[in-house]
Every structure is written in structure tokens, then in C-alpha cells.
Amino acid sequence: MTDFIGKTHRQIITFNKDLGHSYTPNLNARLIDENGGYFIKTNSSGFRSNIEFKNKKEKKRILFFGDSNTAADGVSNNDRYSDLLGKYFDAEVFNYAISGTGTDQQYLTWKKYAKEVQADLIIIGSLVENIERNKVQFRETVDYFTKK
């Protein structure tokens, strides 16, 4: 069951004292876009996932860190490149990506949430734009759809 239907991904972001912002925990939502919309679900830690992340490893595991490209804004959880790679390699996927983050926040995410998690591979999806995010002390956010 979907908790709510929204028109902006700002409705799924919340303040996080360690990272600046993260996804709202325990969310089940449909976001509407120009293609009709997509579904997202977050776990209790506030990461886009249909499962809770646990340390005990039962098969190959890949951890993903990144910004909106790795979090996959505009795409349902199961259609993200991280999840498709997990299916292809028969691996468990923990996607720690958060929209709008730089590599500094991604490092903090690893340090706080994933440092003790057993993994076979860690993938960091980084864009040149992330370097600019790291350099600024304050960055105003603008929603992609509403431009506000």
C-alpha cells in the first residue's frame, strides 16, 4: 500500500544530523513525473530499499554509494542500475545513494551506516558535479520539477 502520492522528491527527503539530509525512513510512495510516475520504498535507516540492511551476508553483496544517478531519481527501486546489476550477478545489493550528495557525504554515509557491513564489492557512482558540491559550504537546493 502506498503511503502517499507526491509531485516532488523533496517530500521524501528529511533532515539528517550526520549527513545533512537523507530519505525519510519507512516510506512507501509514488512520485508523479512526466512519464506517469514511479514507486519508491525506504527502509528504517532511510535508504531506498525494499529490504532492511543487515550485516550477516548470505550471498555475494555489493554496496553502492552515490548521488541521484545511483539513487536513481525517476526510477522505481527495482529498475535502478544497482538492482539490475545485483540480479545479473546474483548478488545482494545495498544502495546507500542519496540524491544531492557529494563524495564527502557519501563517505560519511559509509562511515556511519556501512563501515561494518560485509561486502564483496563497493561501487561509488561519482560525477564531476560532485566535486563542486564538495567545495561549497552552502548550496541552495532547487527541485527539478517545480524549479523552486
Question: Predicted segment positions?
Answer:
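Membrane/wall-proximal cationic-aromatic binding patches
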Residues: 1-88
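A conserved hydrophobic secondary-structure block that centers on an alpha-helix together
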Residues: 86-107, 112-115
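Glutamate identity and glutamate-enriched acidic tracts
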Residues: 34, 52, 58, 92, ...
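Interaction-surface signature
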Residues: 1-25, 104-148
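Short, solvent-exposed loop/turn segments at secondary-structure junctions
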Residues: 69-71, 99-101, 127-131
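Conserved beta-strand elements of the Class I
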Residues: 61-65, 94, 122
